Amino acid sequence: MAENFVVVDGGVVAPKGFKSNGHKDRKYGAALIYSETDAVAAGVFTTNKVFAHPVALSKDVLVNNNVFRAIVANSGNANCFTKGGMEDAELLVKKAAELLKIPENQVLSASTGVIGRKMPMDIITLEVERAFENMDLENSNENASKAIMTTDAFPKTVAVEFEVKDKKIRIGGIAKGAGMIAPNMLHATMLGFITTDIEISKEDLTNSLQKATDESFNNAVVDGDMSTNDTVYVLANAQSGVKYTDCKDEFDEALTYVSKELAKMIVSDGEGAKKLIEATVYGAETKEDAKKASMSIVRSLLLKTAFFGADPNWGRIAAAVGYSGAEMDMANFDIIIGDISSEKQAILVKAGEQIADCGTPELKLAEEIMKEDKIKIIVDLKMGSFENTAFGCDLGYEYVKINSEYTT
C-alpha cells in the first residue's frame, strides 16, 4: 500500500501549536512537551504488575480528565518501588504545571532510570526548570529527546505530514529506549511521546493509539525484559482544522508509521546492538500465530548472538518458530534471510526442504547478508493468510558490560 504521507522535520514540535524542550546534566534530565491550546490525550502503559508511581498517577489522570496540555518526563530515576514515590511523582507534575501555568490534572508524567532508588527531587525539579527556560529554541525537539535518554546511544525522533482537503495534518514523536525492551502495553525501559494537530475524540485517539502500538512498540524486543515504566502518550490539539472522521485511514496509517519508526530506532539502539532485525511471518493461521512466531524469532538469544557473529545458523530460526506455539507444518514452510537495504535474499528452506547447506551458495549469501546492519527474516508458514512483523536486534559483549555495571 502506498504511503499517503511525507516525512518532515521537527518531531513533537512539527504539529501546529506544540512546544518542547529538555535539559540534562550528566545522569539526570527532564523534558517538557506543551500544547498551547487544549488537547485530548491517550496513553498505553506497561502491563508489568510492578509498575512505577508516574504510571499509576497518569493512568488515574487519563481516566478522570478530558483536557490535557503537557507531558513532563525525567531520566536517571524510574521512581518505582520507593518510599514517597507517589509524592515525588505528584511533585514532578506540580512543578511542570506551575511553570506552564496550567492545572496539575492537565499534565501527564513519565520517568525512566534505576528502579528502587529515591528520586533526587531537588535535581529533577531543577532540570524541569531548565527545560522550561528555552522552549522556543530551534533544536528544542532534539533537546527533549536527548534529555530522556539513559543508556541510549542516540536521540529518537520522527514526524510526518499528510493533506486532507488542502489542509495539512502532522504527527510527530520522540522516544527513548535501549535495554529492558519487551513491551506489552494495553488500552511501553521505553518511553514514547507523540503529538498531532488533528481534531479527534478521546475515544478515537485511544483506539488509534492501541492499534498503532500493537503493530509497533508491542512488536519490539531488545532483551525480553518488560520495564516497570513503559509508557506511550499522544496529545492531539485540533490546530490543523481537520477532523479525524474525515481521514480515519490516513491518520491511522501515519500514526502507525510514526510508532513503527520509533520502535525500530529503539531496537536499533539496543544496548551494544549493531544490527536491526525485522522478522516477518506470512501465511499464519491466525494473527496471534503470526505474532507468536515473529516475536519468538526476535526474542531468541541464540538467534541474537548468531546475528552478532554473522553465523547463518538458520536452524535456530526454525526452532524458534517451532516452539512459538504457532500452528505449522514442518514439511511445508519457507525461511528466507534478506538485506533490508537491498534486494539480496537467501532462500534457506523452501516448502519444508533444506536449500542451504555447507558449501552451498545460499549459505554463503546468507552469511554475507548477516554482516549487514539491517536484516530481514521471512518465514512463510503456508497455513493461512495472516502476517506480522516483529523488530529486534543482535546481542553482543557490550550488552553484558552495560548491564553488569548499570547501578555502579
UniProtKB/Swiss-Prot annotation:
Substrate binds at residues 150, 176, 189, 271, 403, 408. GO terms for biological process: L-arginine biosynthetic process; ornithine biosynthetic process. The active site is at 189 (nucleophile). It catalyses: N(2)-acetyl-L-ornithine + L-glutamate = N-acetyl-L-glutamate + L-ornithine. Its EC number is 2.3.1.35. CDD domains: OAT. InterPro entries: Arg_biosynth_ArgJ, ArgJ-like_dom_sf, ArgJ_beta_C. Its main location: cytoplasm. It is found in: Cytoplasm. The record marks 188-189 as: Cleavage. Keywords: Acyltransferase, Amino-acid biosynthesis, Arginine biosynthesis, Autocatalytic cleavage, Cytoplasm, Transferase. Heterotetramer of two alpha and two beta chains. Belongs to the ArgJ family. This is Glutamate N-acetyltransferase. It comes from Methanococcus maripaludis (strain C5 / ATCC BAA-1333). The lineage of its organism: Archaea, Methanobacteriati, Methanobacteriota, Methanomada group, Methanococci. The gene is argJ.
